[in-house]
Amino acid sequence: MHNTDVLIIGAGPVGLFAIFQAGMLGMKCHVIDAQEVIGGQCITLYPEKPIYDIPAYPKIAAADLIKQLELQAATFNPVYHLNQQAVELKKEGEFFEVKTSKDIVIKSKVIVIAAGAGSFGPNKPPLANIEEFENESVFYFINNRSKFTGKNIVIAGGGDSAVDWAISLSEIANKIYLVHRRDKFRAANESLRQLKDIAESGKIELVTGYQLDSLEGNNSELQSVIVRDLQNNTRKLNANILLPFFGLKQELGNLVNWDLDIKLHHIEVDPVYYQTNISGIYAIGDVAHYSGKLKLILTGFAEAASSLHHAYGKVFDGNALHFEYSTTKYTQ
């Protein structure tokens, strides 16, 4: 059995920053994550995707952000339990005991759930024989941007991922078709401005009012993507790559059995300290929900700070926390 002050579930960007915040307050951390490496979706799904809304970084690749967060957290020697899930929860007096899928037991006074989307996988389009092209011509995640150099690419979707990747890949691709069933995209205003400018240059063609219909090709090599509009008209897009970005399937695993207040795959928390309906268990980042919630990495960082300042009194038996700025608290 391991004993620690704080158990963090999830080693994505918000979980990593929570380690640092706990360390700044003198609290030791163990961390559980289902992936084989730390970083969450930033590493597993889009390590090369540029992120634009991290303070002091006009633009930073997801993998580089994780590298910096890992370095920052390493100061406080966290213990990682990777490639395993939090399975069982028990309360023993003032302590929680969590058992992992590898039968490791971790005892702590506080739990911080920073599980992001939980266990995740892509929402795949219902296209016949799409499996024949997967990992050769059809990709749901991008972990090596350079492989798309000079390609003709169909990107399907209307959210941030579709728009951001269309913008990013337009720098190296021969041609990009951005397919969306509506004529409006759901993305940041600055991204929409960039998309409009690139579309006007001809590097990206907006194919709106259409949905994916079928694929044509041989031996896992895609030759064209057929799209269909609401009037049943079809159009053939000559492309050798399809990138469908229709979001992720969220699975919270055994967390659903912990008597937490869960609605629509999100954990309800109070909007001040992000504590769940169970005292001593907090939820931060994308997995947490409250009125006015913004799903931003930046928001998760702030939630980590607030929740761990509140948790201090639970870890140290009601002792008052005297607030200090990091410049006086900690010097590298």
Curated annotation (Swiss-Prot):
SUPFAM superfamilies: FAD/NAD(P)-binding domain
Keywords, ordered alphabetically: FAD, Flavoprotein, NADP, Oxidoreductase
Cystine crosslinks: none
Record: residues binding FAD: 33, 41, 46, 86, 120, 286, 327
The protein's Enzyme Commission number: 1.18.1.2
Coiled-coil ranges per UniProt: none
Domain of life, per lineage: Bacteria
The protein's required cofactors: FAD
GO molecular function: ferredoxin-NADP+ reductase activity; flavin adenine dinucleotide binding; NADP binding
Catalytic activities: 2 reduced [2Fe-2S]-[ferredoxin] + NADP(+) + H(+) = 2 oxidized [2Fe-2S]-[ferredoxin] + NADPH
UniProt remark on cofactor binding: Binds 1 FAD per subunit.
One family name in Pfam for this protein: Pyr_redox_2
Family the UniProt entry places it in: Belongs to the ferredoxin--NADP reductase type 2 family.
HAMAP family referenced in this protein's UniProt entry, alphabetically: FENR2
Quaternary structure (record): Homodimer.
Protein name from the UniProt record: Ferredoxin--NADP reductase
Protein's organism: Rickettsia bellii (strain RML369-C)
